[in-house]
Amino acid sequence: MIRTDKEKFLEKIKENIDIENLKGDGKIFSYVNRDYLAGDNKKYMNMYDKLSFWYDFGEKWIGLFRYGNTISEMRKNLMKHLEWRNGISVLYVSIGTGKDLNFIPQNVDLKSLDFTGIDISYGMLKKCHSVWKKRTNLTLVNCCAEDLPFKDNVFDIVFHVGGINFFTDKALAIKEMIRVSKPGSKI
């Protein structure tokens, strides 16, 4: 029996979560624990929701003028350190618009990956979906990094680029990333 991407995704959800409560609009699931929607999480969620339409354009030009090509080089180097291979299960925490997916090694077939991206900003996820929907099998979830809706030990790769500075509880977010990673995975 062949499982759909949605079925594969739902198999990863913690058992104490009512699947019916994973609201979604058909493109993006939602699991926002209101307990974590305070402090920096709330502030930056609102900011990134407002910036989402222009984010990639602004990052490209401001980043280029301010940092040269170093941001792209950093992303490319980061992706080299992860153990990419076709067919694995991947979680990208704070996926934003998905720009970093451009730096996954070219020998990896993006459509072969069981790929999940989470972000606290629904606006950024909408932008990510519009850019990546035809190029990947990407499931997007609007949730806080401090309360991931996934079972323990389900992802071969869990990665995050830069947004941790904006989390309300950085230590808890890191613990969550470790919890959902398979033993021996690089984070």
Task: Provide a role label for each language-model segment.
Residues 1-33:
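N-terminal accessory segments
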Residues 24-84, 99-103, 124-127, 131:
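Conserved class I S-adenosyl-L-methionine
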Residues 89-147:
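Class I SAM-dependent methyltransferase SAM/SAH-binding core
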Residues 123, 168-171:
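Short N-terminal helix/helix-N-cap motif within the alpha/beta-hydrolase-1
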Residues 146-157:
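A short acidic, Gly/Pro-enriched loop at the edge of an enzyme's catalytic core
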Residues 157-169:
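A short SAM/SAH-binding and catalytic strip from SAM-dependent methyltransferases
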Residues 171-183:
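A short glycine-rich, Lys/Arg-flanked "PGG" loop and its adjoining helix->strand segment in the class I
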